[in-house]
Amino acid sequence: MAEALLDTVLGKLNAENPEAPAYEVLETYTGKDLEYKAYEPLFDCAVDICKKQNKKAYYITCDTYVTLTDGTGVVHIAPAFGEDDANVGRKYDLPFVQLVDGKGDMTKETPWPGVFVKKADPLVLQALEDAHLLFAAPKFEHSYPHCWRCDTPLIYYCL
């Protein structure tokens, strides 16, 4: 987590005992120190796809578009969705994983096949919570593209 965001993200952990520190910093690293370090995926639905492409996945990448304005200073990269993510994916030769079909539905590799990607959001959060892998799920207000004709969410879909 970015040092500048510690208080914002973790500062309320001591709500029941405000006299106690909310958190303790045990070690400090730069983003570059963590580059290429492996991590365990939250879901394993893309593991086989990555293996078929003979590409390494699930390691830390770095890029300059990550900011300290909100969140944790850590972002998820999905090279199949979004220009910045696609650029980072090419830079690090990440596998191209497409778990959403052309209609915007989750694919059979996921736990939610056939569910529209935006309707899957609460299902994903619930699965993470059930597995005790969810720290928090704050709602962030941000602009999101919608169809000018029918006002449905658009998906940036790389082919």
PLM features: what roles do these ranges have?
Residues 1-74, 83-86:
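Protease-associated
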Residues 18, 36-38, 65, 69-159:
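Residue patterns forming the tRNA-binding/recognition surfaces of aminoacyl-tRNA synthetases
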